[in-house]
Design a protein with these regions (language model features):
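Acidic Gly/Asp/Thr-rich repetitive segments characteristic of extracellular carbohydrate-active
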Residues: 1-29
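All-beta strand scaffolds that present successive hydrophobic residues in beta-strands
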Residues: 31, 77-80, 101-107, 202-209, ...
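Extracellular beta-strand-rich solenoid/capping regions of secreted or surface-exposed proteins
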Residues: 15-24, 37-77, 86-105, 113-128, ...
Length: 245
């Protein structure tokens, strides 16, 4: 069985529960409230070409690991009871393919290490930037350069957006001046970048978000299915694109 708050990989056991519904006319999969961890190691591997994601040139191998895989299934309700599903590495949270009457309710979704990295600008001059890195954004300083990394992945192709909470706006930005600068940790989760920031438009309090521009994964995928219902489902983080119907 699957126990909440065990911090062990529940992926295989949950998939067996989903498959057990195949022989039933109507099923309810019930999760007691708590945390459930999903890892890609034993997850179902799929191959989908999904619109508005990475091209064949950017990511030639279209293979995705899936946390919850519904394939040719009908009349299933997943009752989360406010459970918290935490995904690791790069995974699609769920795929619903060639199904009918599937309902997912009362569950929140997050990643142990979100694919988006964040840091808040504290000080900025034409020659330097001091930023506070979000605790969930894992990084290392290697050869005076900041490297963003996650669970079995490293960011290499950067897309940056600046969030200005004071005005509630988003602005296109660039990681290039940081990529070309010298980085050093000056306090816990605080990094000083020294370089040419004369063209970097930001102000203290802005949050710079950085992700890989290649969308090799999506948050969730619904394919050739009908009567799919999501109720009280909170997606706190997703790799790549969002929920693709």
């Amino acid at each position: 069985g699957v126990q909440p708050n065990s911090f062990t990989d529940v992926t295989e056991a949950v998939q067996k529960a989903i498959e057990a519904c195949r022989s039933q006319q109507k099923s309810v999969i019930i999760f007691p409230e708590g945390r459930y961890d999903f890892w890609p190691d034993k997850a179902v591997e799929t191959k989908y070409y999904i619109t508005n994601t990475s091209s064949e040139e950017e990511v030639p191998e279209k293979k995705q690991r899936v946390g919850l895989y519904f394939k040719k299934l009908n009349n299933i309700t997943l009752e989360g009871n406010n459970a918290h599903f935490v995904f690791h590495g790069k995974m699609i949270t769920w795929v619903i393919d060639s199904c009918e009457n599937i309902r997912i309710q009362n569950v929140s979704v997050n990643y142990e290490r979100p694919g988006m990295s964040e840091m808040t600008i504290k000080e900025i001059t034409p020659g330097s930037v001091i930023a506070a890195v979000h605790p969930d954004s894992k990084f290392a300083i290697i050869n005076n350069r900041l490297e963003w990394y996650g669970e079995k992945w490293v960011a290499r192709n950067f897309h940056a957006v600046l969030v200005r909470p004071s005005e509630d706006i988003l602005l296109y930005s660039s990681w290039t001046p940081f990529l070309n600068s010298k980085a050093e940790v000056i306090a816990p989760l605080t990094v000083k970048f020294t370089g040419d920031f004369s063209a970097f438009k930001a102000q203290p309090g802005d949050v710079l978000t950085i992700r890989d521009r290649y969308r090799d994964y999506v948050g969730a995928f619904h394919n050739r299915s009908k009567n799919i219902s999501l109720s009280n489902v909170n997606m706190n983080s997703m790799h790549g694109l969002g929920i693709v119907p």
